[in-house]
Amino acid sequence: MPAELLLLLIVAFANPSCQVLSSLRMAAILDDQTVCGRGERLALALAREQINGIIEVPAKARVEVDIFELQRDSQYETTDTMCQILPKGVVSVLGPSSSPASASTVSHICGEKEIPHIKVGPEETPRLQYLRFASVSLYPSNEDVSLAVSRILKSFNYPSASLICAKAECLLRLEELVRGFLISKETLSVRMLDDSRDPTPLLKEIRDDKVSTIIIDANASISHLVLRKASELGMTSAFYKYILTTMDFPILHLDGIVEDSSNILGFSMFNTSHPFYPEFVRSLNMSWRENCEASTYPGPALSAALMFDAVHVVVSAVRELNRSQEIGVKPLACTSANIWPHGTSLMNYLRMVEYDGLTGRVEFNSKGQRTNYTLRILEKSRQGHREIGVWYSNRTLAMNATTLDINLSQTLANKTLVVTTILENPYVMRRPNFQALSGNERFEGFCVDMLRELAELLRFRYRLRLVEDGLYGAPEPNGSWTGMVGELINRKADLAVAAFTITAEREKVIDFSKPFMTLGISILYRVHMGRKPGYFSFLDPFSPAVWLFMLLAYLAVSCVLFLAARLSPYEWYNPHPCLRARPHILENQYTLGNSLWFPVGGFMQQGSEIMPRALSTRCVSGVWWAFTLIIISSYTANLAAFLTVQRMEVPVESADDLADQTNIEYGTIHAGSTMTFFQNSRYQTYQRMWNYMQSKQPSVFVKSTEEGIARVLNSRYAFLLESTMNEYHRRLNCNLTQIGGLLDTKGYGIGMPLGSPFRDEITLAILQLQENNRLEILKRKWWEGGRCPKEEDHRAKGLGMENIGGIFVVLICGLIIAVFVAVMEFIWSTRRSAESEEVSVCQEMLQELRHAVSCRKTSRSRRRRRPGGPSRALLSLRAVREMRLSNGKLYSAGAGGDAGAHGGPQRLLDDPGPPGGPRPQAPTPCTHVRVCQECRRIQALRASGAGAPPRGLGTPAEATSPPRPRPGPTGPRELTEHE
């Protein structure tokens, strides 16, 4: 208890001039100059009565609000009013609501006296910062309003806009909006109202500039004036969109101004779900009727609701402050330097207030600005207004998709639209009998069918007509546009349905729907088909040089194999190692013929009966087999492509190749999107291509796709066009092909005038057609009727005789050669047989032929020669006996027994000649027979005992018997002395 008493004494002596708070007094400055009033006075009374009837803050203190009228926005008058307020000992000052300059003066004086100031109107621009004190504002900050307008523009995809300002400070007030346009490099034109306040000249300028989005930064009365003048100029149609920054948008009287399709947007802060809102509106309505019986009540003004919330905010802060300390009021004067000691504490509690009022959630940040609130976005109509979205103070926007814009079926139902188009296969074409038809029936194509689907879906009618100048649309130096774009800008058409490319430059002046087809720029060129596969096309996988080197490799391998086999001792072998009576005679299987045949068998992957024995010959065989493996695999891999693909001869393969040469001309459609793409491109290759196309004479630009196709087929010309058209014309003409890939990615859309009310309806309908697969069905209908198949749809086909007929020719030639050789061998053999048998050649040939054509006989007996001379075996044996050994080889001796007398080694004798006749010359040595060391010893013994018969000859009968044929393909057929 002593402590509490001491505290009260300290407070009493510390504030001797403060009076104990018996009533909570506030001062409200009203600047309402309207006839019927905005209801601010009534709102203050309602707030006072509601608070006094529910709570007492502080204990036994009632709320009192002193009202002061401000006749005009004057600094002197405002200062005089404040000098009247200060001696009354108020805890807060409210208002004014519509005089920013006066509100700034009030804030300055309250800051000097440390009395909280509650603002209920727009901020002054620029916003003054006070070092000692600050006020709090229930009105949205300029930054929030600017951000809300900017987000709405982005939500509706408005590329350009015009700003009408009532005061010069609007650029500072809407600083965030202006900064957004500067960053996006979009167009924002600013127009200032003059002192006459007549917006007609400004509206005419906006109409001439083809700007459809208009932002009005003014109070409610001036905004109403601008809209009324706009209605007189016919600028309130569906083409124009208005955004008002005033927060009194709900009370604007727009009867007779807005149309059914008008788009006028504004903001509202009212919390219609507040429990006291119906009573508040009813009370204001009754007051309005008492003061203004002749006019209709428009609704509650925002300033009245802000005054109501301001009283509650101050009471809430005082109640919280009173819990920690007792509050006392102090009369002040303008001429003194005294301050209210509790003002700073109350200001701190004001910043901490959290209250749900008629204007929504009330909270403040450290700067005293309102935060954590919402702005309802309303759209005006004849029936009133409807909410289409909400903007939150955390800089987010939520649009209501169900109420955004007008219902589709109600917008286009039973309306007739003028549709401009351009002839372009297969999008829009004339029917073959179009002269006998009229209206829309004259045309057909993909776009015509799509337009018919849209009309059935949205229930509208249309009238097709061709664009007057036959162009898609490009900007002129004077700023105007040609083609379909120009007709949309000048309102000559409602829609443009064709192969209409969506570009950023066109989007600035017209609107587009969502793309109904995605594509890119491609290169179309005429190709010369390569020669068709001939009878000898199986030789195409390898060049002639490769075939020549393969032949040389074959000959080289054969020679190396022959030499290696002759030099290596491991290739000489005994053909009969198991017969002990046989002599040690070594044979070599690699004769010259076998050496040539062995690589052929390996190359043909068939092998042969000849197997290498020595390491050297195996090495040669291995590398040859590896060589043939790679060659055959490569040949097989390339053969199918060379026999099935008819190669095309294309001199360039990409846009870079096209830009690097000058032999082939290239160009685009004049005044089309492709031309604009190259004109605006910053890529070096495309810039070079544009410089070439622009400077080339005669011009490389064409007026239509058909002209470009004809130029491609008749000259060295590459046509740059959209990939979908490229695909269509390649299906019609097989001599056309696409070079490289796509140069960009874009889409075709339906064009509309800027701000057209049909944009969203048509976009949604296109999306619905895509989801139902109707657009894909239409594309297949008009693209799959060509004579040439799609390149990616090639399938394997059976090879004809024109592909592989040459191998049959080779086979037939080989068979003919084989038969010819067989006939020659047959003739040669029968001729020799006839001489040995001493019969006529014809008789011998007839007998051999009879045996050869006998299908059942597979063997025959060898005929013996007639008697009368020594047998061939005896002659051979005699020749062997007369052979001598020289350098490890067997040679036949000469007449005098000297081998050297006959000019060196000769071959073995085949026939000793007639009986009693002279001996023939000594033959050359048998190069494939080698005599071992044992034979050398026998030869020496035979030379020492010349008269003794050699061991192993047997009886004379055996000596005279015909020799046995030796097995083996290369073994010698002659008998040696051992046999």
UniProtKB/Swiss-Prot annotation:
> How does the protein associate with the membrane?
Multi-pass membrane protein
Q: Which CDD domains match?
A: PBP1_iGluR_Kainate_KA1_2
Q: What is this protein called?
A: Glutamate receptor ionotropic, kainate 5
Q: Where is the composition biased (Basic residues)?
A: 856-867
Protein family membership? Belongs to the glutamate-gated ion channel (TC 1.A.10.1) family. GRIK5 subfamily.
Its gene name is Grik5
Q: What does this protein do?
A: Ionotropic glutamate receptor that functions as a cation-permeable ligand-gated ion channel, gated by L-glutamate and the glutamatergic agonist kainic acid. Cannot form functional channels on its own and produces channel activity only in heteromeric assembly with GRIK1, GRIK2 and GRIK3 subunits.
Record-linked SMART domains: Lig_chan-Glu_bd, PBPe
Q: Which residues are glycosylated?
A: 219, 271, 285, 322, 372, 394, 400, 407, 414, 478, 735
| Superkingdom of origin | Eukaryota
Assembly notes: Homotetramer. Heterotetramer with GRIK2. Can form functional heteromeric receptors with GRIK1, GRIK2 and GRIK3.
Membrane-side (Cytoplasmic) residue stretches: 566-622, 825-979
Q: Which UniProt keywords apply?
A: Cell membrane, Cell projection, Disulfide bond, Glycoprotein, Ion channel, Ion transport, Ligand-gated ion channel, Membrane, Postsynaptic cell membrane, Receptor, Signal, Synapse, Transmembrane, Transmembrane helix, Transport
The intrachain disulfides are 36-292, 83-334, 165-170
Q: Where in the cell is it found?
A: Cell membrane; Postsynaptic cell membrane; Presynaptic cell membrane
Which species is this UniProt entry from?
Rattus norvegicus (Rat)
Which parts of the chain does the record assign to the membrane side Extracellular?
A: 15-544, 644-803
Q: Name one GO biological process term.
A: cellular response to glucose stimulus
- List the coiled-coil residues: none
InterPro entries xref list: ANF_lig-bd_rcpt, Glu/Gly-bd, Iono_Glu_rcpt_met, Ionotropic_Glu_rcpt, Iontro_rcpt_C, Peripla_BP_I
What Gene3D superfamilies does its record include?
1.10.287.70, 3.40.50.2300, Periplasmic binding protein-like II (3.40.190.10)
The residues the entry assigns to the signal sequence are 1-14
Q: Name one GO molecular function term.
A: transmitter-gated monoatomic ion channel activity involved in regulation of postsynaptic membrane potential
- One short Pfam family name for this protein? Lig_chan-Glu_bd
Tissue specificity comment: High expression in the cerebral cortex, pyriform cortex, caudate-putamen, hippocampal complex, medial habenulata and granule cell layer of the cerebellum. Weak expression in globus pallidus, thalamus, colliculi and the reticular thalamic nucleus. Expressed at high levels in the trigeminal ganglion neurons.
